[in-house]
Amino acid sequence: MSKRDYYETLGVSQDASEKEVKKAYKKLAMKYHPDRTQGDKSKEETFKEVKEAYEILNDDQKRAAYDQYGHAAFEQGGNGGGGGGHGGGFGQDFGDIFGDIFGGGGGGRGRQRQQRGSDLRYNVDLSLEDAVKGKSLEIKVPTYVSCEPCDGSGAKKGTSAKTCSTCHGHGQVQMRQGLFAVQQTCPTCSGKGKVIADKCTSCRGQGRVEKTKTLSVKIPAGVDTGDRIRLSGEGEAGEHGAPAGDLYVQVNVRDHEIFVRDENHLYCEVPISFVTAALGGDIEVPTLGGKVKLKVPKETQTGKMFRLRGKGVKSVRSSTTGDLMCKVVIETPVNLSGDQADLLRQLEEKMASSSKKHSPKETGFFDGVKKFFDDLKS
C-alpha cells in the first residue's frame, strides 16, 4: 500500500519552516494521541503517520533525503521503511514538545526513568491453627537498603551528581550513520543523565547497601497455601535513590494430623464403637476451638458424614465461615477376652435366627450377587 506524502500528512507546504512543521505536528499529535482517542484504532494509525512524518521533516538531513528520493530514501534497512519503522511506538520522541500535557510522554530525548528496586519473596510455613486464627511474626530478610551516609544518592556527603556532559542530561545520544540518526544509551552515564565524580565510600556510588532487615508481619486469619501478603516498599532499594520494590510473603500451610482443609471447610474422621453406632449416643469430636459434643443416631453406618456448621475456617476475604465435616468410622474391637468373644458369638447367633434383617449392606450385597447370576442365565 502506498504511503501518504509526509508534507500532506502534516498539512504543510514543502517550503514550510521548522517552526511551522513543529506547530503542525503538535496540533495533530494532541488531536490523535492515544490518551485522548480512547482506543480508536483508526486514530491510532493516524497518530503513527503524523509522528513518522514529523521525525523525517524535523531532521534536516532526513528531510533533504526525502525531498530528493521520497519514501525510498528510508527503505532497505534504513531508519524505518515499510511504514512501521518510525511510528512503531507512542511517545518516544515528542516529550520535549508536549510532555507537560501528557505527563512526560516517554521521550527518547529525556532521561531514562529510575529503575525501582527488585521485588522480593519470603516463604512462611504456618500450622493450620495459626493460618485459621492469624498470627503476628517477625521475619529477617536479606536485601538492599538505601545508603544512609549519602541518603541514597551515591555521591560523597557534601557533593552531588553532575549533569552528564556527553548527553547533557538526556540519558541518550544520537549516532550518525550516513543519512540516518540512531539513538543509543549514553555510554558515559549509562542512561541516567548524571555522573558521580566523588562516590560515597559506603555504597561505592550505588546508593544502596546490603543489609538484613527485621520486619513485623501480620498474618490475617483464614489464609491458605498460595496466599500472598504484600508489603509495599519493603523490597530491594533502587540504585541512586530510586524507589524500592515490594516484598511478598508467600504462605504455606503445613498438613494437620487430624484435619484436612478444602477452601473454608474442614474434614476429619471420628472413630466410634460398634455399640454406639448400633444404639446411638453422644460422642466428642475435635474442632480447632476445642472438643464439642455430637449426637450419633442409632444404626449409624461407617462412613456417615455429619456437618457441624460454622466450625470450619473464617474466610480471609469475607465474613463467612466454613463447616466441619465429620466422617464416623466404626472401630472393630481388638484384644477380646474369651468371655467377650463368646458374647459376640451369642449375639451373632441370635441375630442370625431372627426374622428381622440386621445387616442392610450385607443383604444388599448378596441380593446383588444373586441378581448378577440370574441375569447371566437369562
Swiss-Prot record:
Gene3D superfamilies, per database record: DnaJ domain, Heat shock protein DnaJ, cysteine-rich domain, Urease metallochaperone UreE, N-terminal domain
Keyword NAD: no
Necessary cofactors: Zn(2+)
Gene Ontology BP term (one): protein refolding
Keyword field: Chaperone, Cytoplasm, DNA replication, Metal-binding, Repeat, Stress response, Zinc, Zinc-finger
Signal peptide start and end residues: none
Spans of repeat CXXCXGXG motif: 147-154, 164-171, 186-193, 200-207
Organism: Colwellia psychrerythraea (strain 34H / ATCC BAA-681) (Vibrio psychroerythus)
Main location (coarse class): cytoplasm
Record's subunit section: Homodimer.
Domain text: The J domain is necessary and sufficient to stimulate DnaK ATPase activity. Zinc center 1 plays an important role in the autonomous, DnaK-independent chaperone activity of DnaJ. Zinc center 2 is essential for interaction with DnaK and for DnaJ activity.
Entry protein name: Chaperone protein DnaJ
GO MF, one annotated term: ATP binding
